[in-house]
Amino acid sequence: MALITRAQQLCPKRNLTAILGDLGLPLATYYRWQQRAQSQQLADHIVIPSRTAVPPTPQEIDCVVQGAQRHLLLGYKRLAYALMAENKAFLRPWMVHDILDQYQLLGRRAPVPEPLVRPAAADHPDQRWHTDLSMWWFDDQWFWMIDILDAYSRYLVHCELLLTARTDAVERAVQRALDTLVGRARLAGEPQIVHDGGPQFIGHDWVQFMQAVGATDVRTHPYHPQSNGLDERVHRTFREEMPIGAEAILYEAQATMLEYRRYYNDRRPHSALRYLCPADYYRGNPVARLAEREAKLRAAALARAVYWQQEKDQAAKSLS
């Protein structure tokens, strides 16, 4: 505004529109600024008080460092919320980032950006399930793993290892997932079963099965794995984090997979769920969990302020 006023004083013969055109400023923006200036709401007139964050305590720093060394695949945000969920340290993600940077523990790979075209987001649990099969090699042969993922909560409703990928084996696995809904209210046509149109999902037997269980069959676009991107991403997570070696036998691999499923659902913070766990959204109260976490963060900040004030008072006392 001061620059415009000065230009009007130096060039009284030029009208306001010409001056604003030289500055590349729309006329509507100028009048909006003028109204805000009259009410003292321009940015250069607003005094924003500076606040200094209370630094973490040594105990909190040790907890973050040990957590980063123990969980090498967790990024700083997921690590921050995992420590909160375990009631070990209540630090903002940027504070965890600064600690990891200070101790040179930020060497985590950046994800490869990949545009995904997905169906409209689900707005309640069991509205839409994504399913797919992946192949695993161990015990000198190939096995198929089928997983069924709830789109709303990212909850792994069911997963198991199959000896064959025939339609009847897939139907039995889906039926086991549907059995978990016994006793719960289901809307007509739900859940919608989203798949990639593989040979297991296109035959007459599969269509009859979908009609019998009251679910809706949803086939994604051919040659477009991004349409089933939620489940494709889970497969990548399985490959990265589920420790099934080539020497494992079927019983051991099945036990490892079930244990990882419990960890994934109940303890692993999910970036798409504001770093809550899938179980919090699937059958829990995410609003209450977020409020509880925020309250713990505020309490931890107050405790840190008290800690450093005591350290300051003790240092002053030792000098006197």
Tell me the role of every PLM-derived stretch.
Residues 19-36:
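Structured, charged N-terminal subsegments at the starts of enzyme catalytic cores
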Residues 50, 211-213, 237-320:
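C-terminal domain-tail junction helix/linker
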Residues 1-14, 61-70:
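Short, amphipathic alpha-helical "recognition" segments used to contact nucleic acids or chromatin
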Residues 31-128, 225, 282-288:
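Basic, flexible linker segments flanking DNA-binding modules
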Residues 15-22, 79:
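Short alpha-helical "recognition helix" segments of helix-turn-helix
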Residues 89-93, 98-109, 116-145, 151-263:
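RNase H-like DDE/DDD metal-dependent nuclease/strand-transfer catalytic core used by mobile genetic elements
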Residues 7-10, 67, 86, 241-245:
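Alpha-helix C-capping/helix-to-loop hinge sites
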